[in-house]
Amino acid sequence: MTLILGIDPGSRITGYGVVRQTARGCEYVASGCIRTGSGELHERLQIVFRGVSEIIAQHGPVTMGIERVFMARNADSALKLGQARGAAIVAAAEAGLEIAEYSATQVKQAVAGTGGANKEQVMMMVMHLLKLTQKPQIDASDALAIALCHAHTRSSLVPHGLATARRRGGRLRL
């Protein structure tokens, strides 16, 4: 049994999802959003860091999956997203978690079976796979999808040895 944290980073809303990976699949543990409000960027990043740290302390995951930054049309938005990712990654690294990064396409492929799935399709598959009766918030749904992607990827890597994945700066590059 392994607890996995998924993070969908954002400078205003960071989604999180925790799943328990067992021999029979994944089970829902918790999900939600860290809302940072509209303060100064450094204050919002501190809220992300503290929020992720609290989730780790509360649930005790041993590994974390996080979405990679995509190139946005607005460079300022991409920079802020990258900084929010950094705050979440530092919180996980401080807690000693194994950290892996996934592109949005990888997450969609792992959960919905196609890298071109829309958010609604991903949410419906998350609900189906985790047997949820209510729709989670969209950012929480994305984070649960990242956790499921990480669980699936870990399962396929373990028989081959995690050594097949490249390590850079303490993070798995898959």
Swiss-Prot record:
What does the UniProt keyword field contain?
Answer: Cytoplasm, DNA damage, DNA recombination, DNA repair, DNA-binding, Endonuclease, Hydrolase, Magnesium, Metal-binding, Nuclease
Q: Which residues bind Mg(2+) 1?
A: D8, D139
Q: Write down the EC number.
A: 3.1.21.10
Catalytically driven reaction(s): Endonucleolytic cleavage at a junction such as a reciprocal single-stranded crossover between two homologous DNA duplexes (Holliday junction)
Needed cofactors: Mg(2+)
- Top-level lineage group: Bacteria
The residues responsible for catalysis, as annotated, are D8, E67, D139
Question: Which compartments does it reside in?
Answer: Cytoplasm
Query: Cofactor note from UniProt?
Result: Binds 2 Mg(2+) ion per subunit.
State the oligomer form and interacting partners. Homodimer which binds Holliday junction (HJ) DNA. The HJ becomes 2-fold symmetrical on binding to RuvC with unstacked arms; it has a different conformation from HJ DNA in complex with RuvA. In the full resolvosome a probable DNA-RuvA(4)-RuvB(12)-RuvC(2) complex forms which resolves the HJ.
Name by which UniProt lists this protein: Crossover junction endodeoxyribonuclease RuvC
- Name the species this protein comes from: Pseudomonas putida (strain GB-1)
